[in-house]
From Swiss-Prot:
Disulfide links within the chain: none
Protein's UniProt keywords contain Secreted: no
Record-level GO cellular component terms: membrane
CDD domains the UniProt entry points to: MFS_MFSD4A (cd17453)
Sites carrying sugar chains: 177, 203
Species annotation: Pongo abelii
PANTHER family: MAJOR FACILITATOR SUPERFAMILY DOMAIN-CONTAINING PROTEIN 4A (PTHR23121:SF10), SODIUM-DEPENDENT GLUCOSE TRANSPORTER 1 (PTHR23121)
Keyword set includes Transmembrane helix: yes
Localization per record: Membrane
Lineage: Eukaryota, Metazoa, Chordata, Craniata, Vertebrata
Family of this protein: Belongs to the major facilitator superfamily.
Topology term for the membrane: Multi-pass membrane protein
Primary location: membrane
Name of protein: Major facilitator superfamily domain-containing protein 4A
Keywords (A to Z) from UniProt: Glycoprotein, Membrane, Transmembrane, Transmembrane helix, Transport
């Protein structure tokens, strides 16, 4: 009860910035899930081949990773962070508005690269601001943050669905199976098997399509609707920024991010309160910079090996789990329509929505659970659940019912892994390392690499390899998590004093002492 009261008190003191950071992650979610269902329409719009349109995915993921790594540049002050979030969320609305006018695949790839940069910046900055505000109490707020990702990712396919073209924009003399709307590798693999003597249309550029086909114009409405829905988000950031810049008339006002720490200080003995009057620390946190600054910090020279091992193993866990999230959502449709399941294309189209829907539900359920369960326990349950679910799917690979149940189960188990791992790692390192930047970067790399790797294996080995990859990557995630627990036990930074005292002590020590 006391913990819940403290958390609710923290939320009341930081309500506006917290709601703003949550809404910014809604923009992130909107932008992360719309490419899959709109792929065929965008391909028709740009008159491009499958290998050409695949660069759109790559450009978004690569720039998302780059934006995550460089996001720390904008975290040095609160004003920089808010300006970065305002620019990024506004850029996402502009991207949605501009996509219908991209008639060339290179232009579309460039636009999606801009979206990726904005998403990466949002990912790093919003996560870090919440961790910086709430520190040891950040687990609950991170769960809500990532709930908004799932909500946005669930909403964007639902918005796009009524506007997707049912017509086939392929040449009339093509005998290709065009019903596999969602995925590049599925179509190219099927065509490669069934049309050995013919040149597959996946390597051909579509002939010019006249505007009469409407394949580009109908889906344009979906993008414009998403642009309008997202528009209040940059406005909310601008309101918070203007509120932060008001104190020209009242210089006594302190930064918004300080209130959570003031509340923590109120529970300390008087001598500790007097010793920690360091508000500038919260304007520029030395422990939370961009990836390159973290790697070059001189005050990490004395850190024990376990300090670096915790960073690496935690990032590897998220490399696997976030990579599985991206790969499963991208290829579950292709797996379902293939033999032995041969699910109807319309029915299979519900699988990605089911997956993201249960991710959203899982993040919603994790909000109250995270206030009563340790982040380490939640991550353990999640990773074990992922492995068990993939094993069940592999054993019952001929059963469509198990595919739908397993998809929902995977969504639940993967939903809270990232925020729980972030809260656990930051607390293990006493908020002194570069955990947020490293973990966000590791998750971004995993989402990009595993999606490409699973797609290549799927194309070469067949649909059964999809579940085998899931089992392997799930087991690797579990192995890395066990190693993380081991290094956490070995870490000399584990004090016997309460966590609350640690959150204060970390302000007075910027480097490890051997």
């Amino acid at each position: 009860m006391g913990c819940d009261g403290r958390v609710s008190g923290l939320l009341r003191r930081n309500l506006q910035p917290t709601l703003t950071y949550w809404s910014v992650f809604f923009s992130f979610g909107l932008c992360i899930a719309f490419l899959g269902p709109t792929l065929l329409d965008l391909r028709c719009q740009t008159h491009s081949s499958l290998p050409q349109i695949s660069w759109v995915f790559l450009s978004q993921q690569l720039c998302l990773l780059l934006g995550s790594a460089l996001g720390g540049v904008f975290k040095r002050t609160l004003a920089q962070s808010l300006w970065a979030l305002f620019t990024s969320s506004l850029a996402i609305s502009l991207v949605f508005a501009v996509i219908p006018f991209c008639r060339d695949v290179k232009v579309l790839a460039l636009v999606m690269a801009l979206a990726g940069l904005a998403m990466g910046c949002i990912d790093t900055v919003a996560n870090m601001q919440l961790v910086r505000m709430y520190q040891k109490d950040s687990a609950v707020f991170l769960q809500v943050l990532h709930f908004f990702v799932g909500f946005g990712a669930l909403l964007s396919p639902l918005i796009a669905d009524p506007f997707l073209s049912e017509a086939n924009c392929l040449p009339a003399n093509s005998t290709a199976n065009t019903t596999s709307r969602g995925h590049l590798f599925h179509v190219s693999r099927v065509l490669g098997q069934h049309h050995v003597d013919a040149k597959p249309w996946s390597n051909q550029t579509l002939p010019g399509l006249t505007p009469k086909d409407g394949s580009g114009t109908r889906v344009s409405y979906a993008f414009w609707i998403m642009a309008l829905i997202n528009l209040p988000v940059p406005m909310a950031v601008l309101m918070l920024l203007s509120k932060e810049r008001l104190p020209t008339c009242c210089p006594q006002r302190r930064p918004l991010l300080l209130s959570a720490d003031e509340l923590a200080l109120e529970t300390q003995p008087p001598e500790k309160e007097d010793a920690s009057s360091l508000p500038p620390k919260f304007q520029s946190h030395p422990g939370h910079e961009d990836l390159f600054s973290c790697c070059q910090r001189k005050n990490l020279r004395g850190a024990p090996y376990s300090f670096f091992a915790i960073h690496i193993t935690a990032a590897l866990v998220l490399f696997m789990t976030d990579g599985l999230t991206g790969a499963y959502s991208a290829f579950v449709y292709s797996y379902a329509v293939e033999k032995p399941l041969s699910v109807g294309h319309k029915v299979a189209g519900y699988l990605p929505s089911l997956f993201w829907g249960f991710i959203t539900l899982g993040r919603l359920l994790s909000i109250p659970i995270s206030s009563r369960m340790k982040p380490a326990t939640m991550v353990f349950i999640n990773v074990v659940g992922v492995v068990v679910t993939f094993l069940v799917l592999l054993i019952f690979s001929y059963n469509v019912v198990f595919l739908f149940v397993g998809t929902a189960s995977l969504g639940l188990f993967l939903s809270s892994t990232f925020p729980s791992m972030l809260a656990y790692t930051e607390d293990s390192l006493q908020y002194k390392g570069c955990a947020t930047t490293v973990l966000v970067t590791g998750a971004g790399v995993g989402e990009m690499v595993l999606q490409m790797l699973v797609g290549s294996i799927f194309q070469a080995q067949g649909s059964y390899s999809f579940l085998v990859c899931g089992v392997i990557f799930g087991c690797l995630a579990f192995t890395f998590y066990i190693l993380l627990l081991f290094f956490h036990r070995m870490h000399p930074g584990l004090p016997s004093v309460p966590t609350q005292d640690r959150s204060i002590g970390m302000e007075n020590s910027e480097s490890y002492q051997r």
